[in-house]
């Protein structure tokens, strides 16, 4: 079958939910037996989001092949079976970088390099390259229609229909139909103007996904259909949902996937959404109530910074048939005021990844609290490094234990810069990135979770456990339960005499899905549930 292309754009406001819409559509098409791949086009000039502040961009999602990408790729992987790659996310910066490189090599034979056709051709070539082997390629264009930054991408997808034909391309536009409280009614004008902007560029949307906080009346659908030149059956409401994993079911109920396969002339089986129905049923009516998990971090004022982490904890709850309540705790507040009162009401403590010294002493205090009070603890990336430092200080007697990330002249560098990082002088794309193998020791909590010895997990770090301190810390009771054999790196640490105290250098949250929860999150939430029941 010739690959079909679905382009998803957004209008009126940013953060309208294009990524979730794209991911949900991917889930629906997979449930019909189609092979789906996904891609995000980002209009910013950064080469990738790897060096961007979490407060501006949110989470950086890491793929198996080490790409630092937009958080929407996390949605794509969680909702579908796709394993995405560097080809799945590209930016204006990457496009221009590639075109300029070709110009310097002389690939354009002395021609004048312009946005059209050179930039748009480069965009199209990247879309085609990523789509190889798929029945359907879903491509989300970042930004909002009307933004100057998005114009080259929109022009490229406009040309795509001309190149591939109407039967092989589909335009889905996500827009907003707000309810104006003072007027007591919903307004279609923002949607009309958004579509007008899109049509000025030469793109006539085939399907409109209308984001709204209540049901869209039939007369509103007719009005939108008339003014936007879209069939009434293709004006599809996307009403706010209590649970994001209910979105595929809601869009299926509105016949989105049916419209898509009909317009693209694809024959498929009927969708089997039973797994998604089971997930939503668990979220709405968990058998074992609620567990409270504290996330002690640095970026708690912007929870998008921990998007995959929050979702992975939810998946752990699904696996244990319980609801997970997340309590975000600012590590700096613990530094300033002490740990008492912040963690008294939680069933588990998690310290996530991060960079820089700010808030680290608060994390150490939180880890000590969880260790000494037998509260389930999970440390990830920097969280593992802080757990090693806390153990070195308070159990091994190394009062000066620290990381060279924070103090170059650290007296007891329990955590230090990886050897291959010492010659690196650029920040972007230079960390230890992507999937790396790890061997898990039998008879440990990590092995109990994975139930296998050879695993692969995704990384994003420069600093590591200092092997100089291995003997001392293992003598004092620390178990090094996961090792990268290739480079002899410590990947997982745990305490055998604690109900559940485990920390890992990698990011397991990047591989967790609602239909297949990650083993470590399943185990952590299970331990937290047990702790709650014993309190």
Curated annotation (Swiss-Prot):
InterPro entries xref list: Class_I_gatase-like, CTP_synthase, CTP_synthase_N, GATASE, GATase1_CTP_Synthase, P-loop_NTPase
A GO cellular component annotation here is: cytosol
What the record says about activity regulation is: Allosterically activated by GTP, when glutamine is the substrate; GTP has no effect on the reaction when ammonia is the substrate. The allosteric effector GTP functions by stabilizing the protein conformation that binds the tetrahedral intermediate(s) formed during glutamine hydrolysis. Inhibited by the product CTP, via allosteric rather than competitive inhibition.
Name the Pfam families for this protein: CTP_synth_N (PF06418), GATase (PF00117)
Binding positions for CTP per the UniProt entry: 14, 147-149, 187-192, 223
Catalytic residues per the record?
381 (nucleophile), 507, 509
Glutamine amidotransferase type-1 domain mapped to chain residues: 292-534
Which residues does the annotated region (Amidoligase domain) include?
1-266
Q: Where does ATP bind?
A: 15-20, 72
Amino acids binding Mg(2+): 72, 140
SUPFAM superfamilies assigned to the protein according to its UniProt record, in alphabetical order: Class I glutamine amidotransferase-like, P-loop containing nucleoside triphosphate hydrolases
Task: Quote the record's binding site residues for UTP.
Answer: 14, 187-192, 223
Q: Does the keyword Phosphoprotein apply?
A: no
Q: What are its GO biological-process terms?
A: 'de novo' CTP biosynthetic process; pyrimidine nucleobase biosynthetic process
In terms of CDD domains, this protein maps to: CTPS_N, GATase1_CTP_Synthase
Protein EC: 6.3.4.2
Q: Which reaction does it catalyse?
A: UTP + L-glutamine + ATP + H2O = CTP + L-glutamate + ADP + phosphate + 2 H(+); L-glutamine + H2O = L-glutamate + NH4(+); UTP + NH4(+) + ATP = CTP + ADP + phosphate + 2 H(+)
Sorted alphabetically, the keyword list is: ATP-binding, Glutamine amidotransferase, Ligase, Magnesium, Metal-binding, Nucleotide-binding, Pyrimidine biosynthesis
The pathway noted for it is: Pyrimidine metabolism; CTP biosynthesis via de novo pathway; CTP from UDP: step 2/2
**Other noteworthy facts:** CTPSs have evolved a hybrid strategy for distinguishing between UTP and CTP. The overlapping regions of the product feedback inhibitory and substrate sites recognize a common feature in both compounds, the triphosphate moiety. To differentiate isosteric substrate and product pyrimidine rings, an additional pocket far from the expected kinase/ligase catalytic site, specifically recognizes the cytosine and ribose portions of the product inhibitor.
Q: What does this protein do?
A: Catalyzes the ATP-dependent amination of UTP to CTP with either L-glutamine or ammonia as the source of nitrogen. Regulates intracellular CTP levels through interactions with the four ribonucleotide triphosphates.
Q: Which family does it belong to?
A: Belongs to the CTP synthase family.
HAMAP family cross-referenced by the UniProt entry: PyrG (MF_01227)
Quaternary structure and partners: Homotetramer.
**UniProt-recorded name of the protein:** CTP synthase
Q: Which organism is it from?
A: Trichlorobacter lovleyi (strain ATCC BAA-1151 / DSM 17278 / SZ) (Geobacter lovleyi)
* Encoding gene per record: pyrG
